[in-house]
Amino acid sequence: MSEKYVVTWDMLQIHARTMAKLLLPAEQWKGIIAVSRGGLVPGALLARELGIRHVDTVCIASYDHDNQRDLNVLKRAEADGEGFIVVDDLVDTGVTAKAIREMYPKAHFVTIFAKPAGRPLVDDYIIDIPQNTWIEQPWDMGVVFVSPLAGK
């Protein structure tokens, strides 16, 4: 990936609240299925904003930091998705999204970020990201002290 897009905690919360507004009224949803690991934090934020207590996970391994590899479903929520929001942080190439669509054909699939190749596979997303851009999520970064430019 040639470009990077850095997401802060504040930005993520703002984007999740924007997504929650699109998902109102909350009463239409039975629960949330968060795609582990990228969808865990957005899923928690959506659960809070929508007052949803039923939160489950589908655990899929497809990345080692910035390298996509074969899809491996480690755990799935038992349902066809009807009445559920499935949330992930991002749709990229669409490989994971296609698997999600097959597992939960009746779910409402949302992501915070969407790249062109995967965009048609989600029902809602908030931010367009170019295909060649790597997203640095806040849970993958640490906050560190940076010396002033004119520091002593």
From Swiss-Prot:
Q: Name one GO biological process term.
A: purine ribonucleoside salvage
Q: What cofactors does the UniProt entry give for this protein? A: Mg(2+)
Q: Which residues form the signal peptide?
A: none
- Which residues hold xanthine? 92, 135
What does the entry list as the binding residues for guanine? 92, 135
Keywords from the UniProt entry? Cell inner membrane, Cell membrane, Glycosyltransferase, Magnesium, Membrane, Metal-binding, Purine salvage, Transferase
Q: Pathway it belongs to?
A: Purine metabolism; GMP biosynthesis via salvage pathway; GMP from guanine: step 1/1; Purine metabolism; XMP biosynthesis via salvage pathway; XMP from xanthine: step 1/1
Reactions catalysed, semicolon-separated, are: GMP + diphosphate = guanine + 5-phospho-alpha-D-ribose 1-diphosphate; XMP + diphosphate = xanthine + 5-phospho-alpha-D-ribose 1-diphosphate; IMP + diphosphate = hypoxanthine + 5-phospho-alpha-D-ribose 1-diphosphate
**Residues binding 5-phospho-alpha-D-ribose 1-diphosphate:** 37-38, 69, 88-96
Output the Gene Ontology terms for molecular function.
guanine phosphoribosyltransferase activity; hypoxanthine phosphoribosyltransferase activity; magnesium ion binding; xanthine phosphoribosyltransferase activity
Membrane topology per the entry is: Peripheral membrane protein
Q: Does the keyword Cell membrane apply?
A: yes
Q: Which InterPro entries match?
A: PRibTrfase_dom (IPR000836), PRTase-like (IPR029057), Xanthine_Guanine_PRibTrfase (IPR023747)
Please name the NCBIfam families in this protein's record.
PRK09177.1 (NF006613)
As for family, the record states: Belongs to the purine/pyrimidine phosphoribosyltransferase family. XGPT subfamily.
The protein here is known as Xanthine-guanine phosphoribosyltransferase
Q: Which organism is it from?
A: Sodalis glossinidius (strain morsitans)
Biological classification of the source: Bacteria, Pseudomonadati, Pseudomonadota, Gammaproteobacteria, Enterobacterales
